[in-house]
A protein has these predicted regions:
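Short aromatic-centered micro-motifs
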Residues: 30
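Short, surface-exposed, charged amphipathic helix/loop patches that serve as local interaction elements
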Residues: 1-25, 43-112
Length: 112
């Protein structure tokens, strides 16, 4: 999902035009490169992160994420964007600070 009307997600949850939590399942609206997008830490996203970071289990993933490389950040951002509904997210051009904020927002929403 990129751009478009963010007044409704199609899943019964209101979407925030400024970013922030937008759904009961932990979705978060973020702005990446001036485009509103949705991130969500799903079970599938966690599995993708484990695979992409070549770690086994959540504890190992959490430890690895304490010091992410740029490649690692791309893996994690793409996973949470797919969790938010995107099928082929293009993340290579996203600024690192925006990427880190989006990833943090997805994890924070999942922890609530």
């Amino acid at each position: 999902m990129s751009g478009g009307d963010w007044s409704h997600s199609g899943r019964g949850a209101a979407l925030s035009p400024q970013g922030g939590e937008i759904g009961a399942r932990g979705e978060v609206g973020v702005v990446l490169g001036g485009v509103r997008r949705r991130v969500c830490l799903t079970l599938g996203a966690l599995a993708e992160i484990e695979t992409g970071l070549a770690v086994e289990g959540l504890a190992a993933a959490a430890e690895r994420m304490k010091a992410l490389s740029a490649r690692d950040l791309i893996v994690v951002l793409a996973a949470v964007l797919r969790g938010g509904g995107e099928t082929a997210p293009d993340v290579a051009g996203v600024e690192p600070r925006e990427a880190a904020r989006a990833v943090a927002a997805a994890f924070e929403a999942a922890a609530r």
